[in-house]
């Protein structure tokens, strides 16, 4: 665990962030830990920028339209199905999909606000039920592989309390437009892409960027031949300072 005080982090040449999925409830402590490490990837500045999804507003590319509600802001529900989730979150914690006019959404927003969260409100795109989302993975700034994920949030479902809603994953080849948008997304990140050990760009039909995962994304290495070897080689190079 990243918060295990018994670990001598200075003993390691390189720490690679992977499964720190409990950080949303104590983001400040997580970032302080990362900043205390001798060498960590992705870098602490990347983690600070990426662990609050308000970064989406600064990318300047085609993203899923998002309204951010600060504590005290009231929800004006879209006239179509929509998704409510916290801006600091991992997996499907705190996320739920609602139909237009569902009054439970306001209660959901208030609960998130009461916990100190900024809330994201996004339209649910109808094509997601059929096409799902495509996740494009990059290692050392270079495209590695992609998977397709089926729609995960059922209409009217309860906000996720565990780390994950069950996923259905399959290997896929991204379209030319999807790859081009993912490449532009990495170029829009305010850090040199070659310095990103790993990155995952999640796209919805359009294509539109849903998220750019630079902190602790599942990389689905088992869905692409050679992906694990590419990551291992990149870690080895980084540990040698290359």
Which sequence ranges carry the predicted segments?
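ATP-grasp fold ATP-binding core
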Residues: 59-60, 66, 78-95, 116-131, ...
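Short, solvent-exposed loop/turn elements at beta->coil junctions and helix N-caps
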Residues: 2-6, 72-73, 122-127, 200-204
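Conserved N-proximal alpha/beta basic substrate-recognition cap immediately N-terminal to
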Residues: 1-71
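Short glycine-/acidic-enriched loop or helix-start segments at secondary-structure transitions
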Residues: 26-27, 52, 93-95, 131, ...
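ATP-dependent carboxylate activation and anion-phosphoryl transfer catalytic cores
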Residues: 174-242
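Short acidic/polar capping segments at secondary-structure boundaries
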Residues: 46, 71-74, 87-91, 101-103, ...
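Phosphate-binding site of ATP-dependent enzymes
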Residues: 99-191, 204
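A short beta-strand motif that forms the metal-chelation/ATP-contact edge
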Residues: 12-17, 85, 134-138, 205-218
């Amino acid at each position: 665990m990243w918060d295990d005080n018994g670990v001598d982090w200075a003993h390691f040449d390189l720490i690679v962030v992977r499964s720190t999925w409990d950080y949303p409830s104590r983001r400040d402590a997580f970032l302080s830990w990362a900043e205390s490490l001798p060498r960590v990837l992705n870098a602490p500045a990347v983690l600070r920028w990426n662990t609050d999804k308000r970064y989406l507003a600064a990318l300047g590319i085609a993203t899923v339209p998002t309204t951010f509600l600060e504590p005290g802001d009231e929800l004006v529900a879209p006239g179509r199905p929509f998704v409510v989730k916290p801006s600091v979150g991992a997996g499907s914690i705190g996320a739920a999909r609602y139909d237009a006019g569902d009054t439970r959404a306001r209660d959901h927003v208030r609960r998130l606000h009461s916990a100190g969260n900024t809330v994201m409100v996004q339209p649910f795109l109808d094509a997601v039920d059929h096409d799902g989302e495509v996740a494009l993975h990059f290692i050392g700034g270079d495209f590695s592989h992609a998977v397709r994920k089926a729609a995960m949030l059922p209409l009217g479902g309860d906000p996720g309390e565990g780390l994950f809603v069950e996923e259905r994953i399959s290997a896929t080849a991204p379209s030319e437009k999807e790859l081009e948008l993912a490449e532009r997304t990495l170029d829009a990140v305010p850090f040199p892409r070659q310095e990103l050990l790993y990155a995952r760009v999640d796209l919805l039909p359009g294509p539109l960027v849903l998220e750019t995962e630079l902190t602790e994304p599942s990389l689905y290495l088992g869905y692409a031949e050679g992906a694990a070897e590419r990551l291992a080689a990149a870690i080895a190079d980084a540990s040698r300072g290359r």
